[in-house]
Amino acid sequence: KRRPAIAFVHLLLPPGGEPHASPAGWIGSLDRARDTLESLRIPTIVSSASPGNAEDLNELSEMDPEVLITTSPLLYAAACDVAKRSPNTVFFACTDETVHDNMSGFQARTYEAHYLAGLIAGALSEDGVIGYLANDPYQSKASRLRNANAFTLGAQKSKAAIRVLYAPGNDPDEELKTLIAAGADIVDLERALPSLVERLREHSVRYVGT
């Protein structure tokens, strides 16, 4: 039996799905890449795994793919565990954390979009105070800080005296209230959830985000 060349492992989505897993989004882009590989007669397989569950990945690694790609930062821990036990497979993990001998990392350049968001927020802010809510659970801590720093640099490029308030996203609803109470007139939302957007509208606070 021919050894699979490349295995793609997506995050197992909760019931009802995940709006960011749209055909035009991150997973859709990876699926198009897989389609291209198939068109070149490079055999691939695709699967999904639960966060932190190494057994899901271990079952796939037992098929002995040449390359195994995990497409979510939430699969990083499981990928690390399985990579140590699968020396004949090359792993690519969606992470900016520590990698290993047979594991490399890749990450989207989300900070570029947040820099542009900062340029806009800094230019449009009337009160000189804006906020950043790091509420995307799919981002690592390092990615969140990098995105927030890029947002701040963009805002300062537009308005040198701008104040940027940072909220780590541990309790998005309460932290958003705090940002509003502190005078932020524009907030960058890593995830523009309907409940957060509605609260901003109630207080006539603008936002940027996805």
Model-derived regions, located:
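Extracytoplasmic "Venus flytrap"
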Residues: 2-37, 46-51, 140-144
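An alpha-beta-alpha
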Residues: 117-162
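Short beta-strand elements in bilobed, periplasmic/extracellular small-molecule ligand-binding domains
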Residues: 38-49, 157-170
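Periplasmic-binding protein-like
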Residues: 65-73, 92-94, 182-193, 206-210
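Second-shell loop/turn segments in exported
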Residues: 17-24, 65-66, 102-108, 134-142, ...
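Flexible loop/hinge segments that line or gate small-molecule binding clefts
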Residues: 84-107
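Short, well-structured alpha-helical segments in soluble
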Residues: 52-64, 171-183
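Short acidic, glycine/proline-enriched helix-loop-strand junctions
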Residues: 85-89, 146, 150-153, 163-165, ...
